[in-house]
């Protein structure tokens, strides 16, 4: 999939704005161009997020947007969706310059955005969420619920979505909520749909369904903007792609004209020589031993050992119970069965505080809901896990030392930020993830549990985190790494534990692990 030959030489990556052209043409005709951005710039305090960028979406195409975290992708999409106002430049819709006053104005003009962090109302029904503020009314001016159900059912039939319109959103899986968001965007009959990392929490089957919907929309003449870090998705679904780097536009190409390595070079401005820098380090004594661990109704009979310096990967399909095991180990949801031993001694862990006293750290899979304090700054986020240990003396926090260590950690992890007092919600997803990793490294853990450590992170940041994890293992940290990305599991793990429907189905040594064997165990 990644061996497509270059059909023509790569364009100059630093080409000026005037040289922009759609792939395979000398410039898309205005009638073919649904949306165009010219010379758009946007700055925040201490940060130039976009520097005179350009972008174009053509009718009946899927246009992927690629770039490292912090490249400016999300900022540009929020400008197009009316969330932000650009400091300079212009936006053209169907060839006409427009000034968007807000998201509702963008919707009225045919632009809908499906955010990575879903924006549904959990205590409302599926139908109510889709048609909010547009509900059909009866002759008394009240909501016509029968018409609402019929309208939703017709929309779902059109998109081959099998979800009960009357179900409360809070009862749906993440994948089902994603489909509801897509249906809501389609319900506006928008010409341009922006999808931000839409497959980050989907199974392979759900991704295939999503791609069928995208192809259907493309055939209807819609323009799809598809933000992703996954190379295989770009080659499978995108007609063309644009790359941004450090707030600048780098180039646009047809997806058939480039290789995976070409795109990585455009994204990071350098070669990534080793994506999975797993070091051969001495494996020490057993640090964590788990026997017949279980949580009633969730998972059962999970047994494994984790040694100092070892990276134990955990694989399995979405819903297999991988994250639940991590939560039980860390005391988020205490185990109801089984035994946990640390350094050979049985321990009972019913709270995260108890887990931390035993030298554990836990990076959760959902940085928005269970990781970041979005309204607080980097310093507050990074220090959150250490305020009860070595930085507190006689009930006083050693603020100066803590700040110095947080600054050093931020530099080591190469967090892109104006300073420690920047609100974390203003950072890209990859930089937020680095801050959370830094939070736990400050606790100097002996056992590090990582749940989807590189989800939603660009290829350059992935390699950085892989190097960091490998280095930690080299220092004797025992790492339990849960990941839905098969190359990551195979490339980084000394052994791979596989789960299916709440059961552990096997543990495979690194030398014996391959995708076929892991998937066989994951589907038993």
UniProtKB/Swiss-Prot annotation:
Enzyme class at the top of the EC tree: translocase
SMART domains: AAA
Gene3D superfamilies noted in UniProt: P-loop containing nucleotide triphosphate hydrolases
Keyword Transit peptide attached: no
Principal location listed in the UniProt entry: membrane
EC number: 7.5.2.11, 7.5.2.7
Catalytic activity: D-ribose(out) + ATP + H2O = D-ribose(in) + ADP + phosphate + H(+); D-galactose(out) + ATP + H2O = D-galactose(in) + ADP + phosphate + H(+)
Keywords: ATP-binding, Cell inner membrane, Cell membrane, Membrane, Nucleotide-binding, Repeat, Sugar transport, Translocase, Transport
InterPro entries xref list: AAA+_ATPase, ABC_carbohydrate_import_ATPase, ABC_transporter-like_ATP-bd, ABC_transporter-like_CS, P-loop_NTPase
Binding-site residues, ATP: 67-74
Topology in the lipid bilayer: Peripheral membrane protein
A Pfam family of this chain: ABC_tran
Record-level GO cellular component terms: plasma membrane
CDD domains according to UniProt: ABC_Carb_Monos_I, ABC_Carb_Monos_II
Localisation per UniProt entry: Cell inner membrane
ABC transporter domain ranges (all copies): 35-271, 281-520
MF terms (GO), sorted A to Z: ABC-type D-ribose transporter activity; ATP binding; ATP hydrolysis activity
Keyword Cell inner membrane: yes
Function statement: Part of an ABC transporter complex involved in carbohydrate import. Could be involved in ribose, galactose and/or methyl galactoside import. Responsible for energy coupling to the transport system.
Family as reported in the entry's similarity comment: Belongs to the ABC transporter superfamily. Carbohydrate importer 2 (CUT2) (TC 3.A.1.2) family.
Name of the protein: Putative ribose/galactose/methyl galactoside import ATP-binding protein 2
Annotated organism of origin: Burkholderia ambifaria (strain ATCC BAA-244 / DSM 16087 / CCUG 44356 / LMG 19182 / AMMD) (Burkholderia cepacia (strain AMMD))
